[in-house]
């Protein structure tokens, strides 16, 4: 594989100290629609999201679930990670491609929830230590 082609942003995960406050801000101030809010409130899912458009969401990840920043060098402030989408052809060789480019895979392939439902994802760090998720639906 020559290189992968990312086609769109899927989601951004923000570490938030107060999920309810963040939901109010993103829904009432910025006009984004809450998703999985009732499931979060009932304990069925670990975090809610707000939708930017049909293909992009912001996950509001409670900091109580995040590793402490001194232990978790992959995070920079409140950015947990961001996710890019690739096509099936690019994803089929993603682990070999990353390994060939001396990029260590932190996790995956693994099934995770995203802006359009479940998909298969791989996680790794960029040169500055930001966690990147690449996924294929």
Predicted regions and their residues:
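Amphipathic alpha-helical "stalk" segments
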Residues: 1-3, 42-48, 55, 110-115
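Core segments of cupin and vicinal oxygen chelate
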Residues: 15-58
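A short, acidic/glycine-rich surface segment
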Residues: 36, 65-71, 108, 112
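Vicinal oxygen chelate
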Residues: 2-5, 8-18, 48-52, 70-137
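Conserved beta-strand in the GNAT
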Residues: 59-61, 133
